Structures are given as structure tokens and as C-alpha cells.
């Protein structure tokens, strides 16, 4: 992963506080982790834009580093995407990731994908809504499981022509990354991160989607499993 930064994901203030000493270039407030923190449900689609934005504003107070926000599939049509982008930027987002999922977006392995016309309209809406010239829109391509490599390559080609800040590739394997990174492209290619993934030529960054939270959660579950239901009183108390 040399020269390719890792963007750790968080959903809670506790996790973000632990990450503050990490030499990251930015942190990703994953919608799924935010929903897990607020509702106990690991599904980004359970949060409205206003709920997510309110949580983002609180998290913004905990760090000066860039925060990557989860724009999901725009929270509706292109008009909704426009106003959602404005709200999240004003709430402290420095980067906003827009998924090509069909609305409503949900955290799943094989999500239904929007039409190219719909996704293009939302990308333009998000780009038009940005107020700060330093704020970036990243396009998230999630169609590999349902659309295949050829369709994803065609989509990457036209998405790359837009004035976005990067393209995030999800649901990949090594062959997929080899094919996509071999394509001519002008924008940064970022892949969702998997544990123990080796450095990969052509990938400019890795986006964590919850490994840290999963590891911490497994540790907590183990502690709770081993927690005794009752504690014996000391003998001196029983006398």
C-alpha cells in the first residue's frame, strides 16, 4: 500500500477519537457505521439525510482532518442529491461519495444499480451543488456483482470525463482491479479496502468500510459472551 493512503472508516465519536492519532489523510464516516451507532442497524439506508448530517456535524467537532461523507445514492432524485450535497458540505464534509446504487441505497453485497442517465444526473447535481472549490465529489461504482466487468469498464470511462475528485471501486477482485487500472483514466482510482491487501499498482487509495469497527465489535461481543450472569459475594459479606 506504499504511496496509496488508507482512509479509515468510523461511525461513532469513540472510534473517531481513537483514530485522531492515526496518520491518515482523512476519515470516512460510513453511513452503515453511523446507522449502527445511532440505531443499532448496519444499514446506511436506515438514516435520512438530515439524521446523517446532524451526526456529521457532531463528528466534525472532533477532528480537523478531512471527513469523507456518505452521500449514498443522493437520498432521492437529482434535485434531492443537489440539496443533500449542500447540507453535507455545510455540515463539515470535505469529500462526498455518491454511489451508483438505485435509490434507496442499502448496505448489501449485490445492490440494484441505477441507470446511467440517473447516475449522471445525480453526479451533475452534486457537482453543481458544491460551494467550496476544495470540496470533492467521488463516484462509487458498485455494479460489479450485477453488471459485470464490461459494463463497469464502460461506466468508468464516461464517469472519468466528469470534473470529480476520484472514482471508488467496490466489490472487486484482483482481476477486476487489473482490468480497471489498465484503462486510460485521469482521476484517482480508489478501492474499498480488505484486510491484508497487498500494494496494487494503479490504485491511488484504499477506503475502509468498517474493518476497524468490525474488529472492535467482535472483541466487545467476546467480552459480553464471557461476562458472568451473577457474581459471587465475598465470604466476609456473607457472614
Predicted features by range, described:
Residues 1-66, 73-230:
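Alpha/beta enzyme core
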Residues 229-239:
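Structural signal for terminal/edge beta-strands and the immediately following C-terminal loop/tail
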